[in-house]
Amino acid sequence: MRVVVLGSGVVGVASAYYLARAGHEVTVIDREAGPALETSFANAGQISPGYAAPWAAPGVPLKAVKWMFEKHAPLAIRLDGTRFQLQWMWQMLRNCTADRYAVNKGRMVRLAEYSRDCLQALRADTGIQYEGRTGGTLQLFRTQQQLDGAAKDIAVLQEANVPFELLSPAELKNAEPALAAVSHKLTGGLRLPGDETGDCQLFTTRLAALAESLGVKFRYNTPIDSLAIAGGRIAGVQCGSETVRADAYVVALGSYSTSFISNLMKIPVYPLKGYSITAPIVNDAAAPVSTVLDETYKIAITRFDQRIRVGGMAEIVGFDKNLRAARRETLEMCVNDLFPGGGDTSKATFWTGLRPMTPDGTPIVGRTPVSNLFLNTGHGTLGWTMSCGSGQLLADLISGKKPAIQADDLSVHRYLKDVAGQTRPAYA
């Protein structure tokens, strides 16, 4: 089968790779000059299935109000003048209940755990290298309230059989030796030893090369204008004056997926702006060995070979990609507070990206009401974590195979109108 994949971020490239492995003739189209040059370029670098969780959580609405007045707040909201933004925020608020959080986190962990398994199999099969580490993830708590609040996450981890360790301040140094110097600032930590880290952009570039070796064609610097419709099916992709035709089409355009298919269906994928800095390591003993999550600031600090990546925060501000100096200040403050002297933040590069987020946190992967159109988008802050599993899942669906995990609750159908014409709730 001929398949066109739109988008060459980590999700699009993973989709292409697994489709090619399944025997399909695949073409990837992207407006950029190469793979992973937008949202996948400088993300936090963590592959954290156990920490796969929706931003829509109990207590978040009240926290959001408090964060409005804090200098280093992890969340910021600025109205962009669109009705879509208001609708999306309302849908997100409706998911901020304990019941919805448990459902959403459960299916996110399911896909993320499967994706980690797919990544491990890929690594064993191909030997792909991307400055990856398998040292786990450590979530740090600065208050007793944060530590107590981890109970709901631990319950989900236990239900999903995800191994974890609850550490006291004195035990944190066993996972991250450099934290011994700052343990007095912390009340404890939750460690997931099965989590991994790695450079997403490097991984995507090398996976694209592997995909090319399987026959995948990459068409970069190519405009993606619209989908041509005929007889209720996709008849082609309009790329400037050219129409590219295939048997099936995959939209993996991140935050831009929403507007691209708006004439066919309405999907609630909104750009959640995040930031990162990447600093050279100057003192190995003072640097992290894997990934640390600061629960207070919602910031991830990740170790690559000779670099530290610090990323996080969320701004609901539309498609604004301006770099705000205050956000860099927050990232530098966080890493220097936990790992003083580990990296030289004065020499750090500064980046921002738009994560494609759904109101319930769960991505949209699978079939659509248009028989030959498939979606692989809406992964939010977990595109790197979920990429391989989403790609394999999509390849199975297109190939007519039964997926290895439950997939019906990941599709776009949870957002579309039912047979009675009623819109299904965004928390379905």
From Swiss-Prot:
Keywords: FAD, Flavoprotein, Oxidoreductase. Its EC number is 1.4.99.-. It comes from the Bacteria. GO terms for biological process: D-alanine catabolic process. Its cofactor is FAD. GO terms for molecular function: D-amino-acid dehydrogenase activity. It catalyses: a D-alpha-amino acid + A + H2O = a 2-oxocarboxylate + AH2 + NH4(+). FAD binds at residues 3-17. Pathway: Amino-acid degradation; D-alanine degradation; NH(3) and pyruvate from D-alanine: step 1/1. GO terms for cellular component: cytoplasm; plasma membrane. Pfam families: DAO. Belongs to the DadA oxidoreductase family. Oxidative deamination of D-amino acids. PANTHER family: D-AMINO ACID DEHYDROGENASE (PTHR13847:SF280), SARCOSINE DEHYDROGENASE-RELATED (PTHR13847). This is D-amino acid dehydrogenase.
